[in-house]
Each structure stands twice: as structure tokens, then as C-alpha cells.
């Protein structure tokens, strides 16, 4: 029986990190479903989503792990950092506390992922300009000082959501092309021409769980 060909050439593993309530699940849903969830449930542990994109003529399947922001789940969610090719680190532009905690999230990301993991800083809820509590300029400076990509976005309107995931993928693909990302390394977070059945995952991690409400 003939094997069904893949309709993508690479798999990139992403994680989404940041405080509870910054809109991580809403960003994931907007990217994968093109819809805004007004009542995004709190993520319990992790949630999973996928989407196929195109970068430089290559079809790439993004496997995206949305991690819980509550401190009580940090021990569980840290295990999902390993083997991530990209990380979206999210804060809420209307809540300075979520911005102030970025250094802690960045420390975890740098300690638990490989040195070539692409990290993009996302200032979510850009549609709430009147309630802004973190300036674009200071967040951009933080990103530049720490070697991060940076965008402000809105999970509600969809502004820059596509770009957030695509810009990280472009950088990862660039790292593959220039040889700075070793695809043979288990922690690279990238699979090229995967041999597992379609729908297979990069890891054998348990199914994510959700409950409650919030974002």
C-alpha cells in the first residue's frame, strides 16, 4: 500500500509563554482558527494547536504548545520548553505587572531551550490603546537588549497575529539555511521530512487539559 505523501517539509515546535490572562490561548486560537474567543478558558498545564504555513516556498507545520501562566503549573510546563524551535513570550500592554515578569519568563526560556531557539516578544491587546500601561518604546528596547524579535498584536482584531508566528518561522528557517541550527540535534525543535504518520507529534507528551474561564 502506497504511503500518503506529506504536504509539508518541516515541523517546527513552538511554545507560548507568559503570565496568566495575557491572551496566550486567544492568540493561538486566532492564529489556528482565525477567530477570537471572548471567553478563552485558562489553560491547565498545556494546550496544543497546529497550522501549516509557507516560508520561502517551503511548507512548514507549526506544532504550538500553549503553556499555563499560573505559578502552580510552572513545574509541569517547563518540561515543554525542551526541544522548542521557537518561543512566543507574551505580555499584556494594559498590565505592567505582566511586563515586569518578562525577565523571569526569559530566564526560563533561555535555561530550558537550546541556544538557537528563536524568541519573539509579543505585546498583546494592542486594540486597547486607551488602557496602555507599557509603552511600545520600552518593550522594543527590552527586546533589543535581549536579542528578541518584537511585535505588538491583538488577538481580538487579529492585528500582527499572523506576523508573530511567521516572523519566528522565517528566523528559524534562516538558521537552518545558514547552518546555525543543527537538525540532527534532538533539542533543535525541528523535523525535516518527518517519517511519522501525519498528525504525529514531536514528543509523547500527555494530552493538554483545560478548564475554567479567562484567557
Curated annotation (Swiss-Prot):
It is a lipid-anchor. A motif (Switch 1) lies at residues 42-47. It is found in: Recycling endosome; Early endosome membrane; Golgi apparatus membrane; Golgi apparatus, trans-Golgi network membrane. InterPro entries: P-loop_NTPase (IPR027417), Rab14 (IPR030702), Rab_GTPases_membrane_traffic (IPR050209), Small_GTP-bd (IPR005225), Small_GTPase (IPR001806). A motif (Switch 2) lies at residues 68-77. GTP binds at residues 21-26, 38-40, 42-43, 69, 124-125, 127, 155-156. It is an enzyme of class 3 (hydrolase). One of its GO terms (cellular component) is perinuclear region of cytoplasm. Regulated by guanine nucleotide exchange factors (GEFs) including DENND6A and DENND6B which promote the exchange of bound GDP for free GTP. Regulated by GTPase activating proteins (GAPs) which increase the GTP hydrolysis activity. Inhibited by GDP dissociation inhibitors (GDIs) which prevent Rab-GDP dissociation. Mg(2+) binds at residues 25, 43, 66. Its cofactor is Mg(2+). CDD domains: Rab14. GO terms for biological process: apical protein localization; body fluid secretion; defense response to bacterium; early endosome to Golgi transport; endocytic recycling; endosomal vesicle fusion; fibroblast growth factor receptor signaling pathway; Golgi to endosome transport. PANTHER family: DRAB11-RELATED. Switch 1, switch 2 and the interswitch regions are characteristic of Rab GTPases and mediate the interactions with Rab downstream effectors. The switch regions undergo conformational changes upon nucleotide binding which drives interaction with specific sets of effector proteins, with most effectors only binding to GTP-bound Rab. This is Ras-related protein Rab-14. It comes from Rattus norvegicus. The lineage of its organism: Eukaryota, Metazoa, Chordata, Craniata, Vertebrata.
